[in-house]
Amino acid sequence: MFSFIKWFSTLMENAKKKKGLWFTLLTIGSLMGIFASLYFVNFLVSDVAQKTYENQKNHYVLGFKNKIISQNEYTEALALALSKNEDIANDFFSSDENARKNIDKKSKEIENKINSVLGKKSLSISYEVGNNVKKGIGIDITKEGAVFKSSVPMIDKNGTITNVVVTKDIDTLIENYKKEDKAFAFLLTESSSHKIDRKLKKSAYTSYHDKFYIKSASYDKIFVDQLKSVDFGGILEENGFIKDSKYFYVYQKVYDLDGDFAGLAFVAEQVKDDNSFVNLVKNLVNSVTMVALGLIVSMLLFLF
């Protein structure tokens, strides 16, 4: 080690005596130091940026799951209230045909009141009869499309079972996310799309890469068109994020009440100005890189 230091010192002294060689070594050493330092800084900054995107993705996914819980609680509470309503139960299990009609009337009144508050027809109430019906709460695919569904049993004294079913269109999340300045879209898998009414599917849904279907009329056209550029073949994880020139997308796989893969939920933030999340990260990375480059050059010039 001592011999190497002595050799290096001698080499430097000889190089300083030869101006051309000295400046050549100085230039090469400086450039090597700059490139090595830049590579290291770029690696660290890129890693920080990636972790920032991951944290933002996790935040979006958590927000989506909380919205699902909130919607499920809403439909479940209404279904439970209806299942425990004595007037509805008496009418439903009555042999009087007028009593059964009265149920439909009451249910329709409740539907209309709630939908008038929501601003559109997104909630519906129905009844399923049978001894094998069971309670189920979550996202499901019906002939109307993807919905939040709560199916709660109502049993009479003779053991006859019916299910009070409350559904709410998943597209109600569009307005929720719009208030947060974000875009939302739900894409059905090709297999799940077979459960939708054929006329509705033909008139309202658009095929995406022959793998998914989207109710295009429900969503912002610019957002829907931009979604077509997403590589759906690369979506393998339960959730993840994708970036392009216009949006930062976060996706979450969604499963129906039978546990089957039903579709993909997308939440996206538009890259439209310097205050957008993606641009803030990009500007931060560029600023840190430039500052680091300035410090590295200054240190190298000082050392030599």
Predicted regions and their residues:
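Extreme N-terminal signal-anchor transmembrane helix of membrane signaling/transducer proteins, especially
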Residues: 3-7, 13-47, 286-303
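Juxtamembrane extracytoplasmic/periplasmic/luminal helical "stalk" adjacent to the first N-terminal
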Residues: 19-105, 109-123
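Solvent-exposed, extracytoplasmic
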Residues: 103-118, 134-138, 155-207, 277-283
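Short hydrophobic/glycine-rich mini-motifs in sensory/regulatory modules
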Residues: 154-164, 255-265
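A short beta-strand signature within small-molecule sensing/ligand-binding domains used
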Residues: 144-153, 244-253
